[in-house]
UniProtKB/Swiss-Prot annotation:
A motif ('HIGH' region) lies at residues 10-20. GO terms for biological process: glutamyl-tRNA aminoacylation. ATP binds at residue 258. A motif ('KMSKS' region) lies at residues 255-259. Its main location: cytoplasm. This is Glutamate--tRNA ligase. The lineage of its organism: Bacteria, Bacillati, Actinomycetota, Actinomycetes, Mycobacteriales. Catalyzes the attachment of glutamate to tRNA(Glu) in a two-step reaction: glutamate is first activated by ATP to form Glu-AMP and then transferred to the acceptor end of tRNA(Glu). GO terms for cellular component: cytosol. The keyword Cell inner membrane does not apply. InterPro entries: aa-tRNA-synth_I_cd-bd (IPR045462), aa-tRNA-synth_I_codon-bd_sub2 (IPR020751), aa_tRNA-synth_I_cd-bd_sf (IPR008925), Glu-tRNA-ligase_bac/mito (IPR004527), Glu-tRNA-synth_I_codon-bd_sub1 (IPR020752), Glu/Gln-tRNA-synth (IPR000924), Glu/Gln-tRNA-synth_Ib_cat-dom (IPR020058), GluQ/Sye (IPR049940). Keywords: Aminoacyl-tRNA synthetase, ATP-binding, Cytoplasm, Ligase, Nucleotide-binding, Protein biosynthesis. It catalyses: tRNA(Glu) + L-glutamate + ATP = L-glutamyl-tRNA(Glu) + AMP + diphosphate. It comes from Corynebacterium urealyticum (strain ATCC 43042 / DSM 7109). Its EC number is 6.1.1.17.
Amino acid sequence: MSEVRVRFCPSPTGTPHVGMVRTALFNWAYARHTGGKLIFRIEDTDAQRDTEESYQAIIDSLKWLGLDWDEGIETGGPHEPYRQSQRMDIYAEVLEKLKAAGEVYPAYSTPEEVEERHKAAGRDPKLGYDNYDRDLTEEQIAAFEAEGRKPVWRLKMDHDRRYTWTDLVRGEMDVDGKTMPDFVVARSNGQPLYTLVNPLDDALMGITHVLRGEDLLPSTPRQIALYEALIRIGVAKEVPTFAHLPFVTGEGNRKLSKRDPESNLFNHRDAGVIPEGMLNYLSLLGWSLSADEDIFTMAQLIENFDIADVKPNPARFDHKKMEAINADHIRMLDLADFTQRLRTYLEEFKGWPADYPADKFAFAAELVQTRIKVLGDADGLLRFLLTKDEDLELEPKAARKNLKEAAKEPLEAAIEELEAIAEEDFRTEPIEQALSTRLIEQMELKPRVAYGALRVAICGQAVSPPLFESMELLGKDSTLVRLRAGLEQTPFQAEQPAN
């Protein structure tokens, strides 16, 4: 078997979306599984829609996820350049060869003329191009030229055959050539279209397998016809193998749109999804390691991935499942690695100060690693550490529930016990020993009653890292200041929020 060569060739429009990244991932995984090559090129021939910002965003998304490539943008390779906008001379040369070989022909008909011919023949005027110009005489061509018309160039399809191919995802495919009109490969100004340059680049770069989205399935017969024309003029060697990946759907099983917030890859990154979690989840959009194994590493993906195992059915993007898988990958991280990633994330996205003590942060990170689904969750759990004592606001619902009249006694007792602990001994174990002895054993309070009020008083909310560790992180002074402030607000009398 010859070396597998796959490609990822997005257009730089908009923000990277999960469907696009899933395509990149499957190409990457297939290349790595087979020991082949991944080529990364940019299809930027649409000057009105393409932007450098989007171009850079695509590169950033691949680098964030750790999806590397063997040839292409920034890496170089034997088929440079890898941006279509820089390959126009190549396309023009091949277009001239196609013209000379009679594989393409000039078409002068306007859309209105095509519709009129359909109407005159009793056909649906919206049927599309009718191949009229394919058989123009020299005189007719000369007359159109005399009118000042500039032709588009269309590829001659074989309408007397069936276009067949074996799709690695969908099986045997068969399309009647009669249903495929001759299609435009170059505009009247000579500019080549996607219909020409995409397959042409694949041919010139030796692409053996085209793994792409299901939305491009209808174009496959036309591309096969173009490949065959390129083979006849000596530009291509073979028609590649195709595999069309299933749609990614959203709510209601409709195709996930670029406008859907959950389709935006960077929304997930900014919320604190880590690359391992995102890649694991995207792999499941059409593929699985086994029926009962959803969590796996990229090494396992590379070892087991085969494009033939991808299912053709639409794959629904389930945000909750993505977060659950991400939580598993967060827990799988080495503590030091997790701590560094969390710190970088909180400083970049949540405004955490760079000078927050490293030892305290490491302690805090260890407390939340098993309690969060995305890195952003840690900010909600740990924000109380950054809040000045006098600025701490109690979450009303939690305070009403936990700071009732009955909370005064455990708050007073806790303050008394904690005051007796020396500053240098204000650590988790002595704190827990003192409070559990007084509140649980001597006062015979249930832990929920005893500690609920303390938690709300020092953290401002009912959900936090473990209570005694949180007190150690705050330190003796801040802990006591907050407990006294909580006692002053007990029973909590904040007004009910308006519905």
